[in-house]
């Protein structure tokens, strides 16, 4: 209901009464409606000690984003002719328009280069997509960052760069979405999505990870088994596999969800503390240099006192599962006392857990606080301070011998 009242034509305005969450003071704000446009390039900059790396973060493959990336890279190269290489960040990018994936590949490779093929049961669904234009720079060193949430068009770009040995892929294995879906119109304005084909990268491999053709007995879908995966070769003869997304050339550890951090986010405590912090700090340091102080973290821990948030550690979850099995198999009564002792030993202390996970909690607090002052661009800028994948990319691009070796050049 509130959304309906707030929405309207660009240029019109409305008034809203707001209450400060901390002082409870009320005020009336006048807001002018505007057409909101969200860029698929949330952060582009020259990074590194001497601004020698062109960093481009692409959040989604939207209309004309290929040209936007081309212009961004070109601008960074002109600003610093001594640029050592490009870092194309496709982490958390769910994909989008296939044509734009081809256009982005075309920035770094020649025209008439195969990027992706689609193959279906009917020949009408078989298509070949090639680059059509002139590259911006086909020799400039390139790294592509991916993670488990890089999917579809992101995987096509990363897979193409890997298959033709054009760039080094860094991060974690990608999602593995290699299915082409076609939308069919139905009655009553309804639509039906039908899987009609699969994507294949230049080496001939399919990146699809989930095997919908061999469901489990309960109907669930599992990943394609290793026995069904095939080997393929890149342009330089490196071995790559199908059936499981894109495996990076340099693997970095994935971040597992931390129970206490998840609990804090579920209750919006990190978000709320950032708002509280901003209400008492008119300004902060520049986004690139801002760090949460020890006293600020101590204040956050104190602020959490008495607040309701609960969670189970992985050890506690495993113990519960063990108890369930022991009860079913009639072993539990015999080990009940020992079980209780282990349970007591594993019981967690919230303050201790906060200190154990201090680094990640501070990271997330910084994200939220910086966003209050410098918005999403500031958040990305601050995150680059301790981004392990970006550091690895800069290291590779700074070492031509290692870069060439990773690509299988002889």
List PLM regions with ranges.
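Residues in well-ordered beta-strands of folded domains
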Residues: 17, 32, 57, 116, ...
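Short, solvent-exposed loop/turn elements at domain surfaces
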Residues: 38-41, 62-67, 202-203, 240-242, ...
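Residue-level signal for well-ordered alpha-helical segments
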Residues: 8, 33, 46, 65, ...
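Conserved functional hotspot residues or short segments at active or partner-binding sites
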Residues: 206-213, 217-410
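Generic secondary-structure boundary signal with a strong preference for alpha-helix termini
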Residues: 23, 107-108, 124, 183, ...
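Short, intrinsically disordered/low-complexity patches at protein termini
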Residues: 50-51, 79, 122, 140, ...
